[in-house]
Amino acid sequence: MSDVKKVVLAYSGGLDTSVIVKWLQETYDCEVVTFTADIGQGEEVEPARAKAQALGVKEIYIEDLREEFVRDYVYPMFRANTIYEGEYLLGTSIARPLIAKRLVEIANETGADAISHGATGKGNDQVRFELGAYALKPGVKVIAPWREWDLNSREKLMNYCEEHDIPVDFSTSKKKSPYSMDANLLHISYEGGILEDPWAEAEEDMWRWSVSPEAAPEQPTYVELTFDKGDIVAIDGEPLKPHEVLSRLNRMGGDNGIGRLDIVENRYVGMKSRGCYETPGGTIMLRAHRAIESLTLDREAAHLKDELMPKYAEVIYNGYWWSPERKMLQAAIDATQDNVNGVVRMKLYKGSATVVGRKSEQSLFDASIATFEDDAGAYDQKDAEGFIKLNALRLRIAAGKGRQAD
């Protein structure tokens, strides 16, 4: 352990990572550098500075990464219409590559020997952080305290704080939160507590970002989203930065009861886990993006893209953002977005986000051909006869050989 002189820790300022600071100092006799990222978790990050200073930390990094997070990670993911196992919008998964990248960069800047994180040994995040770190810095040493220490309960962590004079607000810490929560600009997640029973309904007061659909306004909210190369660049005609887009859609969606999700998912480490999520802005973005693609993408390109999406989602969920396969898939996905431009009109009402209009100068929708009225010869319906016969040829041959379908 003596070879570790300096460690960069992903630090939230909470109970677990505050204990980790002191544990690293004592166990490894090393200097600790803390890194706190603001990725839109909705909490003040500056208090983490005072807490780190109280623990004797000299080098403290606190960074606003909201714009980089949405622009370089969330937006590329949404170009693929990414969902994991049919429902999950990957709000936690997509936040980890950026944090891993900055941990490695800060380690390089400060001459640190190792990086550390507070992810447990049961979850996916340990995998995501460490796969990212090894992809970016192959020789990096990673210290994962939850896989080393015996502080395996909240009570033990709090006792450790008392024994080592770690500044934690015990007036709130002794009241065990019923849920383990994680938030960023894309979503907030809830796990643990009563959610460990997959039959138990989540309590209404758990949800923090949205009103219940029943309590949402009686009048719908309409919003127009402008796309440029697959990314939303304006809301109701007002140009906005990516993180501003997501922040505003979160508010609009939450006010209308949109984006709640309760699922059991398959973790990469092998177990099933029940989680509840609120992704109001992301839910709106996904439906709007699919709508503008329906107007502008070629059919076969769209269908192939849909086939690639589950693999792309799995790659991100499992922590392989920095892998060759993710970069290859991203290149293919991005190549489809050149003409994904236009405006989508959405109706937000009591938990639903409904597309009610879409338009684009690159639209492949031709009303003169698609019309049910007189098309003035734009489409000769007689051509369909030969098309059908050619496509039925293999079926007719098989049937003629006695291979009738059951």
From Swiss-Prot:
Major place of residence: cytoplasm
Record's GO cellular component terms: cytoplasm
A molecular function GO annotation: ATP binding
Residues at which L-aspartate binds: T120, N124, D125
Family: Belongs to the argininosuccinate synthase family. Type 1 subfamily.
PANTHER family per record: ARGININOSUCCINATE SYNTHASE
Protein name as it appears in the record: Argininosuccinate synthase
Gene assigned in the entry: argG
